[in-house]
């Protein structure tokens, strides 16, 4: 009589230590799990990073004009007398006070429109720039500022340039980038609306591929003995070093399971955690129970990546570029586009180290470079942080195992970070779903 899923999960929890693994990259699923539905509009971040930078620049405009005006006031006759002359006895022809007021007008109008009201239209800055430009041109023509020396030239020019820089920044940076983020958000919502777990293909743009029978790291064989069997070039030694460092980071994450932060779980018992890794940032961890022998997952996910392409349609190409030694290799992977074309295809070059230990199978890796696959204009080159896949054997039942995927990836490009984080967990759930389907099919054939 078979055990209930809950009982199997309990058996697994009693038998498994801290786990980890490296997922080399993100290839967004065409459908997001309902457990990671993007937040509603009212709960999204109030102001984007690029808009906040724009508001800081507007503040700089006011402060810089104010500083120049104060310097101009602080002449031989004293700042108090000059301030009285320019403000109380204001004269359009000779006073700089109106240029300061103009800067304050831009500051208040732009912050009201784009920080307080968070408008997504250019009409506010069109008004402020038009008023500023017209006023400054008229003032330069009709006033006597040019007879006042350097500041007669400097203040109008600086004010004019800053006004147009603000226009350029909003029109070419803020609004286009926020529109792209909005497309991301709507694409994610549309994907969720189509229903979770209905597409063919899981995620993982940079899956760890290693040739069959090329595992190493047995309990009785040291790294020095393995590497001592062959003379390596400087580049090959660097690949081996990178692979060992990635494995060391994975082992450190394993030792800190109590510090994993719970994020989400689903009805299958899959759980996503996060942890902050020094120098590498936020790392996502998927832990899932599989009702199959660990060796089956080891073969499908780690040793035979070509099989993964059959059931993971988001990976369009995978190639082993170089086999450095038995347990170190360099791979090249290409992911398909996702989210209705919002995310363009990414390619990845990874160095991977594969080890077989008493209680687990481990594939760890990190981004690297290779002379045969330089970055091209065809794809955006993504970059993976250290992590890996781990297949954990059960001490009590050889017919079950636990699969753990640690994912630390940078997709590059102008992608909103908060939305990437929202979709990463959903992507990991999708991968677990299709992996479970795959091992179920293989088990039925056996």
From Swiss-Prot:
Keywords: Endosome, Lipid transport, Lipid-binding, Membrane, Phosphoprotein, Transmembrane, Transmembrane helix, Transport
Post-translational modification Phosphoserine, affected residues: 210, 218, 222
Source domain of life: Eukaryota
Residue window of motif FFAT: 207-213
All ranges on the Cytoplasmic side of the membrane: 1-52, 117-121, 171-446
InterPro entries: MENTAL (IPR019498), StAR-like (IPR000799), STARD3 (IPR051869), STARD3_MLN64_C (IPR029867), START-like_dom_sf (IPR023393), START_lipid-bd_dom (IPR002913)
Domain comment (free text): The FFAT motif mediates interaction with VAPA, VAPB and MOSPD2.
Protein name: StAR-related lipid transfer protein 3
Species of origin: Mus musculus (Mouse)
Gene name per UniProt: Stard3
């Amino acid at each position: 009589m078979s055990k209930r899923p809950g009982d199997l999960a309990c058996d697994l929890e009693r038998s498994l230590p801290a786990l980890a693994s490296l997922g080399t990259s993100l290839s967004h699923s065409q459908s997001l799990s309902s457990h990671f539905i993007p937040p509603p509009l009212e709960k999204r971040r109030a102001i984007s990073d690029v808009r906040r930078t724009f508001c800081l620049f507007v503040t700089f405009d006011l402060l810089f004009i104010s500083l120049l005006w104060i310097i101009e006031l602080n002449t031989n006759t004293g700042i108090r007398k000059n301030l009285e002359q320019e403000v109380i006895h204001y004269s359009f022809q000779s006073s700089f006070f109106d240029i300061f007021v103009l800067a304050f007008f831009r500051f208040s109008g732009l912050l009201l429109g784009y920080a307080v009201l968070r408008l997504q239209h250019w009409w506010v800055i069109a008004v402020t720039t038009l008023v500023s430009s017209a006023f400054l041109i008229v003032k330069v023509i009709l006033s006597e500022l040019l007879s006042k020396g350097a500041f007669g030239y400097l203040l109008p020019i600086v004010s004019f340039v800053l006004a147009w820089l603000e226009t350029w920044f909003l029109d070419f940076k803020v609004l286009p980038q926020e529109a792209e983020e909005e497309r991301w958000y709507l694409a994610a919502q549309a994907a969720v609306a189509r229903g979770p777990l209905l597409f063919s293909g899981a995620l993982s743009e940079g899956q760890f591929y290693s040739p069959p029978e090329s595992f190493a790291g047995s309990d009785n064989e040291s790294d020095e003995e393995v590497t001592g069997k062959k003379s390596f070039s400087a580049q090959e030694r660097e690949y081996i070093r990178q692979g060992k460092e990635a494995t060391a980071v994975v082992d450190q994450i394993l030792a800190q399971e109590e510090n994993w932060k719970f994020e989400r779980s689903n009805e299958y018992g899959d759980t996503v955690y996060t942890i902050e890794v020094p120098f590498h940032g936020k790392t996502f961890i998927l832990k899932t129970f599989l009702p199959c022998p660990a060796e089956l997952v080891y073969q499908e996910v780690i040793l035979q990546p070509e099989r993964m392409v059959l059931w993971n349609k988001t990976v369009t190409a995978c190639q082993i570029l170089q086999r450095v030694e038995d347990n170190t290799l360099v791979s090249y992977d290409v992911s398909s586009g996702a989210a209705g074309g919002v995310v363009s295809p990414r390619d990845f070059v990874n160095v991977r180290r594969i080890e077989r230990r008493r209680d687990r199978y481990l594939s760890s890796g990190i981004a690297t470079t290779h002379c045969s696959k330089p970055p091209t204009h065809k794809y955006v080159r993504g970059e993976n942080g250290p992590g890996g896949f781990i297949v954990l054997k059960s001490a009590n039942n050889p017919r079950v195992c636990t699969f753990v995927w640690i994912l630390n990836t940078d997709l590059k490009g102008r992608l909103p970070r908060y939305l990437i984080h929202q979709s990463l967990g959903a992507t990991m759930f999708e991968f677990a779903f299709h992996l479970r389907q795959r091992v179920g099919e293989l088990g039925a054939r056996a």
